[in-house]
Amino acid sequence: MEFKNNTFKIVQFTDTHFGNLPHHEDDIRTFNLIDKILTDEKPDLIVHTGDIMWSDGVKDSDKVFQIVMEYFDKYDIPLAITFGNHDSEEGITRSELRCIYDKTISNKPEKQDVVVINDKENYVIPLSENGEDIAYLYFIDSGADDRFGYGTYEWVLPEQVEWFRHTADKNKKNDSVKRGIIFQHIPVPEYWQSKENILYGVQEETNEAISAPKINTGLFANMLLNGEIWGMLVGHDHENNFDSELFGIHLAFANSSGYQAYGDVAKGATVIEITKDPFEIKTRNIQIDADK
C-alpha cells in the first residue's frame, strides 16, 4: 500500500459485536457509526481488530459475517482484519471466516509473510512510497479462550512470537526509526504495567482493569528488543481506550465501536496517522456520542 502526499491514514474499528438477523437496532446504530466515521475520515486503510460479531448462539453466523464484510466493501477502501475471542465461538471456524472475507472483499491489501498457526492467521502489510517500505503493519491473531485452565483468555502462541521476531528482524533498517505497528485483539500482559503511564484516553474497565492472558509468551519483549516497533493497538476491553507507554513502546486500546457491546464509554473508532517525512505516528480516538 502506498503513501499519498506524505501521509497514510488508518481507521481502526474493534468489537462491533454484530448479532442475530434481523439486525437489532443497536447493530443498525453501529452500521451508522461506520458510515459517519468512514465518510468523515476517508482513510487509506480500514482495520478491524476482532469481535466483528457474536458467534455464540447466533444463527447463520456465516451470513452475519458476510453482511458485515459487504457493508465495509461498499466503500472500496482496503480492509484488513484479525479475529477476537467471540468471532468463532460456535458454528463457524476462523478458516471459514477467512474464506468469506476472501470471497467478499474486493479491495484487499496485499499481505506478506502470511502464516497460519493453529487456524490463527498472521501477516504483514508494508506501507510504501516509490518502492521503498516506510512502515510495517503486523497482524497477529491473539486467539480466543484459554483451554488449559490458566486464566480466561488465550495467549499469543510461542510459534507466533517466533514468526513475529523473524519477520520484524527481516524488516529492520537499523536506523532506530520505530515504524512497526502490531494489531491484535487481546492485550499482552504488559498492559498491566503500561496503564500506570497513560498518555491519553481512559481506563474504565471494571471486571479486570486489563483483560490479558495469564501466560506471557514474550511478544512484548521481542517488540522492545527489535528496536524499530512503535507499539501495539488492541480491542477487547470495551471501557479502555487509552494509549500508554512502557519502555518507549506504545500499548494502546482502540475505541470500542459496537453498540451491542457492553460499556458506557462512548462508541467510536481510533485513527492512526503516519507521516513519512519527518516520520511520525499519531493516534486519536473518535467518539460519536455519549450513549452506549
Label each PLM-derived region with a short phrase.
Residues 1-69, 73:
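N-terminal active-site segment of His-dependent metallophosphoesterases
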Residues 2-4, 124-132, 219-226, 240-292:
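Binuclear metal-dependent phosphoesterase catalytic core
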Residues 21-26, 50-70, 88-110, 194, ...:
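Metal-dependent catalytic neighborhoods of phosphoester/phosphodiester hydrolases
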Residues 41-45, 136-138, 151-241:
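His/acidic metal-ligating clusters that form di-metal
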